[in-house]
Structure formats: C-alpha cells, structure tokens
Amino acid sequence: DIYKYSLTFLAERRNARLDKYMTKINSEFHKLLQEQIGLELVSSNQYLAMSIHYDNLDMPQMTDVFKGHADEEYDHAMQMIHYLQDAGIKPEVPEIPAVRNDFDGFVEPVRVAFEHEQFVTSKIEKLARVARDSYDFSGESFITKFIDEQVEEEAYFSRLLAIVEEEGATVFEIENWVAREI
C-alpha cells in the first residue's frame, strides 16, 4: 500500500540524514558517558525494584521515595542521551542487566541504595576528571550538575540510613520521618 511505502521511504531518508550527521562516539569522555547512560538506567530499575519492595511492606512513603528516585535516574539517562545527540554523537541504549529484587526488611534496601550512590559518585567523578584532562569544556560543564546531584544523593541516603538503622525504629516512625523530610 502506498501509505506504508511512503512512511518506510521517509523513515529511511530520515535515518540516512541522521547517520550522515551523527558520528560514532569519538572520545573517552563520550564513551564513559555512554556507559553512564547504562548505569543510570540500571539505577532506575533498581530503585523501582526497591519501591516495589516497600510497597509490599505497606510503606507508602518509602515506596514514593524510591519511585521518585527511579524516575530521576531515568531522567538523568535521557539528559545524557540528549547531550550526546546535541554533540552530534549517535547514542545507543546498552544492554541493561537484571537488578536485585529481594531484600530483607526495611533497612537493607536503603543500605544498598547508599552504597550504590557512592559507586555512581565515583563514576561521575571519573567523567569529570576525563573531561577536564582532555580539555572537553562542554563535557565538564555538563557533568558538573551531576556532581552536585551526587552530593545531595549521598547526604540524603546517609540521613535515611541513619534513621532506618536506629535501634528500635518502627515502620510508623520511619514513614513519619520520610513524610516530614521529603
């Protein structure tokens, strides 16, 4: 049918135009940023799994905290994808490994999240170092907001971990603290 043929033809022309202008990843910074996209998507999925865990524990405040973080990590991946596209680089969505779905109680997911944020911080800092060392000023400028974000994330999860690890902390107390602080 002519309509289907026209759509296929237009899509092929658009892809050919994009391929003409979009280059493959061409620097260490861009390669690391591509990897970071994958890590942000893994983070999003991991926080979604944690949100489900808290939902199963009937902890709506904690459920919302981790659902919000899942959305935020996905947004970070999209910002990185758009940055690469704006730089004329064709990003690819990497394979995303499975995430952990089983946790014990209400402390373990927060501990895992805090450790994960520390790991993400190390990756973001490496991106900043590589951008600076290669005089990639736009890359350094772009990644700076993520450095600031990581300071906030680590501080937040550190405080949350202190609350959930407090001896005798109850679900009610944790939920109330989260409701007040968020």
Locate predicted features.
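Iron-associated oxidoreductase/ferritin-like identity signal
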Residues: I2-I182
